Curated annotation (Swiss-Prot):
Disulfide bonds: none annotated. Belongs to the polyribonucleotide nucleotidyltransferase family. Residues 627-695 form the S1 motif domain. It comes from Psychrobacter cryohalolentis (strain ATCC BAA-1226 / DSM 17306 / VKM B-2378 / K5). It is an enzyme of class 2 (transferase). One of its GO terms (molecular function) is magnesium ion binding. Its cofactor is Mg(2+). Its EC number is 2.7.7.8. It catalyses: RNA(n+1) + phosphate = RNA(n) + a ribonucleoside 5'-diphosphate. GO terms for biological process: mRNA catabolic process; RNA processing. Keywords: Cytoplasm, Magnesium, Metal-binding, Nucleotidyltransferase, RNA-binding, Transferase. It holds the Pfam family PNPase. This is Polyribonucleotide nucleotidyltransferase. It is found in: Cytoplasm.
Amino acid sequence: MTMFNTIKREFQYGNQQVVIETGRIARQANSILVHMGGVTVLVAAVVKSDAKEGQNFFPLTVNYQEKMYAAGKIPGAYGKREGRASESETLTSRLIDRPIRPLFPEGYVNEIQITATVVSSDKTQSADIAALIGASAALAISDAPFNGPVAAARVGFINGEYVLNPTLEELKESDLDLVVAGTKSAVLMVESEAAELSEDQMLGAVLYGHQQQQIVIDNIASMAAEIGTAKQQYTAPVRNQTLETGMKEQFGTQVSDAYTITDKQARYSKLDEIKDAALAALAGDAESESYADTVSELKEIYNDLKYRTVRDNILSGKPRIDGRDLETVRALDVQVGVLPFTHGSALFTRGETQALVTTTLGNTRDVNMIDSLAGTIRDHFMLHYNFPHFSVGETGREGIPKRREIGHGRLARRGVQAMLPDSDRFPYVIRVVSEITESNGSSSMASVCGASLALMDAGVPIKAPVAGIAMGLVKEGERFAVLSDILGDEDHLGDMDFKVAGSKDGITALQMDIKIEGITPDIMEQALKQAHAGRIHILDAMNKVLPESRTEINAHAPNYAVIEINPDKIRDVIGKGGATIRQLTEETGAVIDIDDAGTIRIFGENKAATKAAIAKIEAITAEVEVGKTYEGTVARIVDFGAFINVLPNTDGLVHISQIADERVENVSDYLKEGQIVKVLVQDVDNRGRIKLTMKGIEQS
C-alpha cells in the first residue's frame, strides 16, 4: 500500500509540458506541486475554518519566494540564506493576489495564507505563471468558497506573432511582455510592458492569452471535482432593512449633495459629518448591548449608500464627483527644472494628484546588482515610488516601501523603460524617484508623466515623451460607463482599474484589475480608445513645456567620455595589482572602467576631471611615432648606449654612436641616469624595439 494518494493532471501549455499534482508533499495544507517546463513550484494554501472575533476585512496573504537552491546557487546575503523578499518576489506576490482576491464572496473574512515556493528552476523562464496556476489549484481543492479556478498566461509578440509563455531569451526579442489572468468566462487582471504597440495589438494579446489558458482552467476544475472537497458554507449577513431604509430616506439626499463638492478634503469632511449625524439618529440607545453591532452595521450601510450614490449618478448621466463628464481629464500643470541642484526634475499636477519627480545620473559603479535564479542582473535603470501619508492629509509611520509602493513604482517603470536609450549609447545608470506630494487617484500614472519630463530635463535622450492615464468603469447589468482619469473615490467605487501609459505612437504599459465578471472585449476596446484620447491630451500639455530631451546633460551630472586604446596597453593603465588605475582615480576623482577590447569609459565629476583622466590615460598608452622628437629621462646606462624613457612604460635605446656628432668613448661622459634629454625616434622594429638618436638635436 502506497504512503501517498497522489492525484495528477498533465497537459501541454504552449511549448511547456505542465504537471499539476497533489497528495505527495505538504499534505497538512492544501498543496499543489506545479511542474511547468523547467520550473517547479510548491504552493500551499491554508484556510481557516472560522473568522477571528471582530474581523472586518478579508485577511488574504500571498507570499511568493524563490529559493536559491532551486537553481543550484548559494545566496550571497549575510548568513548565506534567503532573507527579506526581493522586489521581484514582492511583485509576483501581488501578481498572484490580484486575480484571486475578487473571487471570494463579499463579506468573507476567514484568514487565508498562500505560500508559493520555487524549488527547482532551469533558469530559462519565469516561475510566476506556474505559481499563479498553483495558487488557483490549491484554492480549488480547498474548502474555501473560491469562485475559481483562475489561470494565467504570459504573452509575447515576436515578429508580428503572439507567443504563448515565451522563455526569458525569447522575451529579449519580444515587443511585449504581458501576463493575463482570468476565469473560464472573464479576464480579471492584465500586467504588461510593450514597445509602443497599438491598442488593437494589446487587446488582441489579452484575448489570445485568455483563450489559451482555458486548458489550465479545465484541468484544475477536473482535479478539484475528483478530490471533491466540500466547500465552507458562507452566507453574507442579511442587512437590517429598517436601518437601510432609514439611512437612505433621511440621509440619501445629503450624501448625493456631498458628492457635488469638488474639493476632496471638503467633500470628505462633509461625508464624515453626515455619517456622524446618521449614527446619532439611527444607532439607538448607546447603553444597549446591541449598540456596538448596530453602529458597525450602520457604517457598512452608509458606505454602501455612498457606493450606490456615486454609481447611480454616473450611470444616469450626471456629472462625476468633481463635475467632469466621462472623458474629460482633470486640469493639468507641468513644470520642469524645479529643483536646481538635481540632475533633472519635474512637478506634474493633475487635479488633486501631484508628483515631484527627479532623475539622477550615475556612473557604472552605481548599477543595481540583483541576485536572481537566472543569475546576477545588472540593472541600469531604477524607478522608485514613494507615497507618504501627508499626500492624502493623513498621519502615519514612515518606513520601508510597502507592496503597493513597490507595485506602483514597477508600473511607472514599465511605462517609461521602452523609451530609454540603449546603454551602449547612453551608459549612465539612471535613477528616477517619484515623490507623491498629493494624491486623489492615478498617482502611478502621474509618476509616468513626471518621470518622462524629469528624464528629458536631465538630458536623457529618450525616444519620445510618455504619459499615463487611469481609466475606470461602472457597470450595472447592460448599462456601463467608462471613466477617463479617475479619482480615488471612483477607483474605490468602480468595477475596473485600467491604467495605460504610452507615447503618441503606442502603448508602453498596461495594467488592468477587474472586480466583476462580464467585462466584454467591446468594453475593453472602448476603454483603450478613450485612454488613447486622454493620453494624447496629456502629452500635448507636456510638450508645450518640454517637447524633447535637452541637448546636453545637466551640468551637475557626471561628465562622460569614452576612448579606445590598444588592448596591449590595458595592463599599463591598470598597473601592478591595480596600482596605476587607483592612482588615476585618486588624482582625478574620475571613475574609470576598462573592458577587454580596450574601450575605456570615464565618468568625471565635471568636464575638467574627465579631461584630466583622459590626458593621463593617453600619456600612459601613447605609442612613439617615428620621426618625432621626445623629451625623455635617462633610465639606464650600458656600455653600448643608454635607455631613455620617452613615454610611460616605454623605453628606447640611444646607441653609443647616436649620442653625439663626435665619437663617444664612454657613455657616462655624456649622460647620467635621471638626466633629461631630447631624442628623435629613428625606427621601431617588428619586435617593438625603439631606436633613438641625439645627433643633430639641440639639448636644453
